[in-house]
Swiss-Prot record:
Alphabetized InterPro entries for the sequence: AstB_sf (IPR037031), SuccinylArg_d-Hdrlase_AstB (IPR007079)
Recorded coiled-coil stretches: none
Protein name: N-succinylarginine dihydrolase
Any one GO molecular function term: N-succinylarginine dihydrolase activity
Organism: Salmonella gallinarum (strain 287/91 / NCTC 13346)
Record note on quaternary structure: Homodimer.
Keyword Hydrolase: yes
Length: 447
């Protein structure tokens, strides 16, 4: 059956700021306390979406979350009206204010893990929400992510959206950032590659930075998504690269159809994995970048592998990269050599995503890949599909509500909270989502 890949990109939230919340993510740590520009950030993301849509790629949007997230502060014992709580936490525990104000939901590669209908035992598209258990600010996301996905993938005859795994370290799940699918045509059965950093009885794990994804979680997600057991491979990421800042597999590898583009040090038993894939995937091609051409540290600094690998109608592939790759002489030299060689990657497109990149999120972090047949695509909420009208409307929306300068101290401004809620109220109407945010369901009571 004919199917296409649709990229659902996350809209950057109004509280996008640099707080260094993500230990193991070196860009996040390095840019802590810098001044951010939320309006520029959301527009950089929108420009990427629109450019790819104009080039013929199917593109959609996923909204940001409600931030600052007052319900989490109430859970932590702060009381009073919303404004009183903001004032208290800013004075008593400002780090908590930053955590509940993170715009991290924009990196929707961590929103869920997707199984196309061609791979599922029941013939449905499955999406399992990620619990993001390793970081408090990200563990807040799952309930609203689930509500958003249910509002986008509404037709229960076509889609099954599963709640996140229990919030325990044993089942730490980071979503599609640790998942790749390989195969031929999108509509044909493929091989799903689940990548983990640790498993309970395996002492091989990183020493410096946490391994966020467990094998136990990956196995549970595969079961929830009803992936045919004959179409699954579980592989461990190289713990040494996790300790060099590769906190998700999509920082060191990306796949599309029959191609796996990765660093030669990406996986723990890479030769074994490559041989498995060669046996299981017709026409499989591994493009392994040697360390002598691009070091792991340069790959992390430029996000070479946190790229999008997209299929054109003629079967050739486009590699979508952050500008940092072009700015690095060695990486750019390698990329020009890559497109000149005999492989499906024949073109490169560079985008300026510096606002997201400074927090450790490149092109691949910003998108969730969902393979859909024509019938399934017609069942998706049409209001989220990118087109000229939506692009214009979202830019006008951003101009109205987003600030062009934000510091950690600004998060205590009650006006920012009100601006954010008003903006999301307008956005849910624009995208026909219904009442998906807690403030819409409670009337934002002052408690």
């Amino acid at each position: 059956m004919t199917a296409h890949e649709v990229n659902f990109d996350g809209l950057v939230g109004l509280t996008h700021h640099y707080a260094g919340l993500s230990f193991g993510n070196e860009a996040s740590t390095r840019h802590r306390f810098q001044v951010s520009n939320p309006r520029l950030a959301v527009k950089q993301g929108l420009l990427k979406m629109k450019a790819l849509a104009d080039a013929g790629f199917l593109q959609a949007v996923i909204p940001p979350h409600e931030r600052p997230f007052i319900p989490a502060l109430r859970q932590l014992g702060f009381t009073g009206s919303d404004e009183q709580i903001l004032d208290k936490v800013a004075r008593q525990a400002p780090r908590w204010l930053s955590r509940v104000s993170s715009a991290s939901p924009m990196w929707v590669a961590n929103a869920a893990t997707v199984c196309p209908s061609a791979d599922a035992l029941d013939g449905k598209v499955h999406l399992t929400v990620a619990n993001l258990n390793n970081k408090f600010h990200r563990a807040l996301e799952a309930p609203v992510t689930e509500a958003l996905l249910r509002a986008i993938f509404r037709d229960e005859n076509q889609f099954s959206v599963h709640s996140a795994l229990p919030q325990v370290a044993l089942l730490g799940d980071e979503g599609a950032a640790n998942h790749n699918r390989l195969g031929g045509e999108y509509g044909s059965a493929g091989v799903q590659l689940f990548v983990y950093g640790r498993e309970e009885e395996n002492e091989i794990r990183p020493a410096r930075y946490p391994a966020r994804q467990s094998r136990e979680a990956s196995e549970a997600v595969a079961r929830l998504n009803q992936v045919n057991p004959q179409q699954v491979i579980f592989a461990q990421q190289n713990p040494e690269v996790i300790d060099q800042g590769v906190f998700h597999n999509d920082v060191i590898a990306v796949s599309n159809r029959q191609v796996l583009f990765c660093h030669e040090a990406a996986f723990a038993r890479q030769k074994v994995l490559i041989n498995q894939l060669r046996t299981r995937v017709d026409g499989f091609m591994a493009i392994e970048v040697p360390a002598e051409e691009v070091s792991v540290s340069d790959a992390v600094a430029t996000y070479l592998f946190n790229s999008q690998l997209l299929s054109r109608d003629d079967g050739s592939m486009l590699l979508v990269l952050p500008r940092e790759c072009q700015d690095h002489a060695g990486v750019w030299r390698y990329l020009n050599k890559l497109v000149a060689e005999d492989n499906p990657i024949i073109a490169i497109q560079v985008f300026d995503l510096r606002e997201s990149m400074a927090n450790g999120g490149g092109p691949a972090c910003l998108r969730l890949r969902v393979v859909l047949t024509e019938e399934e695509r017609r069942a998706v909420n049409p209001a989220v599909m990118m087109n000229d009208a939506l692009f214009t409307a979202l830019n006008a929306w951003a101009d109205r509500y987003y600030r062009d300068r934000l510091t950690a101290a600004d998060l205590a401004d009650p006006l920012l909270l009100r601006e954010g809620r008003e903006a999301l109220d307008v956005l849910t109407r624009l995208l026909d989502l219904g009442s998906v945010y807690p403030f819409q369901q409670t009337g934002a009571a002052d408690g």
